Amino acid sequence: MIKFGEAVLGNEIKAIVNVALGKGELIENTFTNALTRGNCVFANLRPNLIVKPLTLVVPRHNIESEIQDELFQGVIQYAVAKAVADLDLDEDLKVVVSVNVPEVPITNLNKRKLFQYFYASAKLAINRALNEYPSKEKVKKEKYRALHPLVGFRDVRLEYPPYLQIALDVPTMENLEFLLQTIPNSDHIILEAGTPLIKKFGLEVIEIMREYFDGFIVADLKTLDTGRVEVRLAFEATANAVAISGVAPKSTIIKAIHECQKCGLISYLDMMNVSEPQKLYDSLKLKPDVVILHRGIDEETFGIKKEWKFKENCLLAIAGGVGVENVEELLKEYQILIVGRAITKSKDPGRVIRMFINKMGYDIDTYRLYFDEDEDIGEEL
């Protein structure tokens, strides 16, 4: 039996702690392998007083200076030792603790900070290991909200609908850059590199869009042929999704969807000029992630026909005639609203965008619990 835990605390100085603990052959091997590294120490409260259960403290990286060596051998390992001693753990456990070793001037203040941060991180990481935190449900809940501090952007997979998809089909680079500068920060916005835009500037236009917007970008290629090649080109240009034309040969559609799956992209299937969207959808061996419907498919009701069953399996997008005045009604049936000229032709596109997204609910972090406040050691909520 072996369990794992992790914790990171601190601001200017960070304490990064990874823990493996348990009983039996697996942890014994881990313990022995750590000992063979030669740069680890037994966690001790003072020389000749190691803590129980036996705990090895291992640096995450090579120690390259006398300052790092003194901090590791001294205050960092002591903080880990004190955390283990205070937890009063089962003596039969074996504990391996991996720590980073910051290189900071040795001052009383820095030593106190290091002790405080590593003590708390070690204690938290051990408790997390014992309680098998986080749960699978926690990871599933956080995967689309997580924002790693060293990355700076989220990997959006359309898991938090509804979305406003802004179709950018402007004729000049000046127009494009103007629009990109007006887009407000929102988790409900998707940008579409429109077909005319891509034809004029190439898929490299997506890289230009990235300089202003690092959210979800759709390459509206309306793929009709060479599905795999076009998807791969969009992937290399950092698109998050590719739009495939529903009037393409079925083999092209399937190959394009398959390539999207291989590349980790979201596949859109555009049903423009498709007379029987449901029949086409049902006939596909591989299903798209998003189906785009157009107002012309059902002018009378402007909604999903009762016999259509897309909603059970994928996200639905609607294009054509989408306005601020009908957002609430459309969101009853569709998860993505595609808007082009109503925004791009506006004198104040930023204001129009905000009018749309203000009707789409809260952003991801609005009611987010900070510092993992839902974490209750001993009984995870």
From Swiss-Prot:
Biochemical pathway: Carbohydrate biosynthesis; D-ribose 5-phosphate biosynthesis
Chain positions covered by the region annotation 3-hexulose-6-phosphate synthase: 151-381
Keywords recorded for this protein, A-Z: Carbohydrate metabolism, Lyase, Multifunctional enzyme
Superkingdom in the source lineage: Archaea
SMART domains: OMPdecase (SM00934)
Single GO molecular function: hydro-lyase activity
SUPFAM superfamilies: Ribosomal protein S5 domain 2-like (SSF54211), Ribulose-phoshate binding barrel (SSF51366)
Enzyme class: lyase
One annotated GO biological process: carbohydrate biosynthetic process
Signal peptide: none
Chain residue ranges for the region called Formaldehyde-activating enzyme: 1-150
Coiled coil start-end: none
Enzyme Commission code: 4.2.1.147, 4.1.2.43
Known role: Catalyzes the condensation of formaldehyde with tetrahydromethanopterin (H(4)MPT) to 5,10-methylenetetrahydromethanopterin.
Protein name per Swiss-Prot or TrEMBL: Bifunctional enzyme Fae/Hps
Organism whose genome encodes this protein: Methanocaldococcus jannaschii (strain ATCC 43067 / DSM 2661 / JAL-1 / JCM 10045 / NBRC 100440)
